């Protein structure tokens, strides 16, 4: 008696990838533990964090049930909604810490720029899937317009860090479509030539100051350099095994700013040490490798470039946050994915993982349609 190779397993029926789900749950538990410490054992914040995790998991499960071809069909509508929301932010968005990035609808407050991190790669993947790969020069130009329209709207908030990530979320999808290295080389040269224009004419004074603080934070230890100095102290004092959960001096004595959001990695490093850092990095590596494996097995161009693009941008999120907190990159306000406190970012990330699981678990259906 032999097993039926076409027989669906439980995970096939619920359209979830158990390996990815297990890694995600481990990261979310890790996040909850560090948030509890970073918040000073704030019960209210912890309750909200658990609610965000629960909502994120529900959205991921729901998104995983929807076939990839539906996402491909929805992409233009989501993209248009995203553009409208970004314009709405510019018109009557809520101002926080000098930036106009939020829409406050009374019952919910969110950042439309987070939606762009899903809407842009979806739209570019849909556009690419309807063309031969690699895309023609004309269609590459159209794809770039689709990428940079929302990017410029986010940059105008101003939010340079998020705008770069939005651009990269689309550019990675375009890269995975098989662009020639010659074209990529030309793009790199153009970007390099644009940097002086960005520095002298487009960046705000505080953004330039952040870059300068990267070189010499001690020049303003109580002002612009304070964040990175305190973060370095926290990371360096953690040692091999850390000071112990809930026993970090920089975090518990509130020397470390934004310790539950952008600088949560410093809290983790101080309290759990190098061992805790390596566990976190191992989970991220496993998650990204699993996502790239799913991308490699996808049966359509849409599935391949979408899953691959989401995993590459996840790597960039992790790299930028850890680099920022460690003092090797400027402070740009990028949270640590799946770990930092924040509902909008977590829900969008979990939605992205739901799409990746959908691409994986619907691959048999896709192979029949090709």
UniProtKB/Swiss-Prot annotation:
Pathway: Cell wall biogenesis; peptidoglycan biosynthesis. Changing residue 260 to A: No effect on glycosyltransferase activity. GO terms for cellular component: cell division site; plasma membrane. Its main location: membrane. Its EC number is 2.4.99.28. Changing residue 109 to A: No effect on glycosyltransferase activity. Keywords: Cell inner membrane, Cell membrane, Cell shape, Cell wall biogenesis/degradation, Glycosyltransferase, Membrane, Peptidoglycan synthesis, Transferase, Transmembrane, Transmembrane helix. It comes from the Bacteria. It is found in: Cell inner membrane. It is a multi-pass membrane protein. Changing residue 117 to N: No effect on glycosyltransferase activity. Belongs to the SEDS family. MrdB/RodA subfamily. This is Peptidoglycan glycosyltransferase MrdB. The lineage of its organism: Bacteria, Pseudomonadati, Pseudomonadota, Gammaproteobacteria, Enterobacterales.
């Amino acid at each position: 008696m032999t097993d039926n190779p076409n027989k669906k397993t439980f995970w096939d029926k619920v359209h979830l990838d158990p390996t990815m789900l297990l890694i995600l749950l481990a990261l979310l538990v890790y996040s909850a533990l560090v948030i509890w410490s970073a918040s000073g054992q704030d019960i209210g914040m912890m309750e909200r964090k658990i609610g965000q995790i629960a909502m994120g998991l529900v959205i991921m499960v729901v998104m995983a049930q929807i076939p990839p071809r539906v996402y491909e069909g929805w992409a233009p509508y989501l993209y248009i909604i995203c553009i409208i929301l970004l314009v709405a932010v510019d018109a009557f968005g809520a101002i926080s810490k000098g930036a106009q990035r939020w829409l406050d609808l009374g019952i919910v407050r969110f950042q439309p720029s987070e939606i762009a991190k899903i809407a842009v790669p979806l739209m570019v993947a849909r556009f690419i899937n309807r063309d031969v790969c690699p895309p023609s020069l004309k269609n590459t130009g159209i794809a770039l317009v689709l990428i940079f329209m929302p990017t410029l709207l986010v940059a105008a908030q101003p939010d340079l860090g998020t705008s770069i990530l939005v651009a990269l979320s689309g550019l990675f999808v375009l890269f995975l479509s098989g662009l020639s290295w010659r074209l990529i080389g030309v793009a790199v040269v153009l970007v390099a030539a644009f940097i002086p224009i960005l520095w002298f004419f487009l960046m705000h004074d505080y953004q330039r100051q952040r870059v300068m603080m990267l070189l010499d934070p001690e020049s303003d230890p109580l002002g612009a350099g304070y964040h990175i100095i305190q973060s370095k102290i926290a990371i360096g004092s953690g040692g091999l095994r850390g000071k112990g959960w809930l026993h970090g001096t920089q975090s518990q004595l509130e020397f470390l700013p934004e310790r539950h959001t952008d600088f949560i990695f410093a809290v983790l490093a101080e309290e759990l040490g190098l061992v805790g850092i390596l566990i976190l990095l191992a989970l991220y590596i496993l998650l990204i490798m699993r996502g790239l494996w799913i991308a490699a097995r996808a049966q359509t161009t849409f599935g391949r470039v979408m899953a691959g693009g989401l995993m590459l941008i996840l790597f960039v999120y992790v790299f930028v946050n850890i680099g920022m907190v460690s003092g090797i990159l400027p402070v740009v306000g990028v949270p640590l994915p799946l770990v930092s406190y924040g509902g909008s970012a977590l829900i969008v990330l979990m939605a992205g993982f739901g799409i990746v699981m959908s691409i994986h678990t619907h691959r048999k259906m896709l192979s029949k349609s090709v």
